[in-house]
């Protein structure tokens, strides 16, 4: 038999964190006592009220059928209320929120929705490995932009435009720009000033700004959303998740 996978599979390798977790497990088995600074997995359980609510609803016969394709109304309304409470952002649960099986699913959906083969995507370096692996599956042209400590680990928009002027980056064919603040892996925080710059950059070059926002409660007494910026909804998509904020990574609950 000669069964071959699709060519696109050749462009990706085993997930970076999967490889590293195996290495860590091997080192720990040798007694090296490695501290894992990789995946941001909370080591505390969800609130007792959340577990109680899950248990009660799991007993209801109505909880086990197919859901609507856009998620149940109550969940979308709860997400809208959550954004209003914590971010001061108004979202229409009927057409501005889509529940996800964790926000990683959203990285794939967004990439396949916007990227044709050969289209450009701006990805931070260092950055979340999934951005690159999904872009490769989509056949996109990856343009990395460096996050430098001397620049506060923020995008250097002037540097990106200089690379464009030199022909090193084709912003005319670039469809998406990935960013996430608070940033993984640098730990740098964001600000409304940064988000305003991102929105302005996206508007200038017709690039969809994709803000991955699972860590907003980690460094901020008042969590930030890029959607707080005027006009952000016209050019921005934000991913969010209950994994870090509510200690629920195994529940796979996210939103876009």
For the regions a protein language model found, what residue spans apply to each?
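Conserved PLP-anchoring active-site segment centered on the Schiff-base-forming lysine
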Residues: 113-135
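Active-site PLP attachment segment
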Residues: 229-256
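N-terminal small-domain helix-loop-helix segment of the aminotransferase-like
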Residues: 2-6, 10-102, 109
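A short helix-loop-beta submotif of the ANL/AMP-binding
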Residues: 137-143
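Helix C-cap/helix->beta junction micro-motif
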Residues: 30, 138, 204-205
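Short acidic capping loops at alpha-helix termini that bridge into adjacent secondary structure
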Residues: 90-97, 117-120, 173, 233-236
């Amino acid at each position: 038999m000669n069964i071959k996978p699709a060519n696109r599979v050749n462009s990706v390798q085993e997930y970076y964190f999967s490889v590293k977790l195996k290495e860590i497990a091997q080192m720990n088995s040798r007694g090296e006592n490695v501290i894992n600074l990789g995946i941001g997995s909370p080591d505390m359980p969800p609130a007792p009220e959340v577990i109680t609510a899950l248990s009660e609803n799991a007993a209801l016969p109505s909880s086990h059928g197919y859901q609507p394709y856009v998620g149940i109304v109550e969940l979308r309304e709860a997400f809208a209320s959550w954004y209003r409470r914590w971010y001061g952002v108004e979202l229409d649960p009927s057409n501005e929120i889509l529940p996800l099986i964790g926000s990683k699913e959203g990285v794939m959906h967004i990439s396949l929705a916007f990227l044709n083969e050969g289209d450009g995507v701006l990805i931070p370096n260092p950055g979340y490995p999934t951005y690159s692996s999904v872009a490769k599956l989509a056949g996109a042209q990856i343009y990395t932009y460096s996050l430098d400590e001397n620049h506060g680990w923020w995008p250097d928009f002037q540097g990106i435009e200089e690379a464009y002027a030199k022909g090193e980056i084709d912003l005319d064919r670039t469809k998406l720009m990935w960013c996430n603040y608070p940033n993984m892996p640098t730990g740098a925080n964001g600000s409304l000033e940064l988000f305003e710059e991102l929105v302005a950059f996206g508007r200038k070059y017709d690039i969809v700004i994709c803000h991955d926002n699972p860590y907003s409660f980690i460094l901020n007494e008042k969590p930030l959303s890029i959607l707080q910026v005027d006009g952000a909804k016209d050019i921005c998509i934000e991913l969010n998740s209950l994994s870090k904020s509510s200690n629920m990574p195994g529940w796979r609950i996210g939103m876009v």
